[in-house]
From Swiss-Prot:
Binds to 23S rRNA. Keywords: Chloroplast, Plastid, Ribonucleoprotein, Ribosomal protein, RNA-binding, rRNA-binding. The keyword Amino-acid biosynthesis does not apply. It comes from Morus indica. HAMAP family: Ribosomal_uL23_B. GO terms for cellular component: chloroplast; ribonucleoprotein complex; ribosome. This is Large ribosomal subunit protein uL23cz/uL23cy.
């Protein structure tokens, strides 16, 4: 799972969970076929479709020099009916 950074929890991503769609941020250089292969191999699910878009990096200033944070890519992964990805929440004891 080198390409997938983390799953995103926003209002939209929670709404998409009802449609069996999962949202995650991935590395910019990863391709759709790589991400699809990793998701199917790691979670044992079947992927129907994948949508992606690039999110812009935020501007950061250090004195007179203006820089920016890294750009990253967000993938919306649609699974076949009957498949799901278990929650990745660590239980506190």
């Amino acid at each position: 799972m080198d390409g997938i950074k983390y799953f995103v929890v926003t209002d939209k991503s929670i709404r998409l969970l009802l449609k069996n769609q999962y949202t995650s941020n991935v590395e910019s250089g990863s391709t759709r076929t790589e991400i699809k292969h990793w998701v199917e191999l790691f979670f044992g699910v079947k992927v129907i479709a994948m949508n992606s878009h690039r999110l812009p990096g935020k501007g950061r200033r250090m004195g007179p020099i203006m820089g920016h944070t890294m750009h990253y890519r967000r993938m919306i992964i649609t699974l076949q009916p009957g498949y799901y990805i278990p929650p990745l929440i660590k239980k506190s004891t």
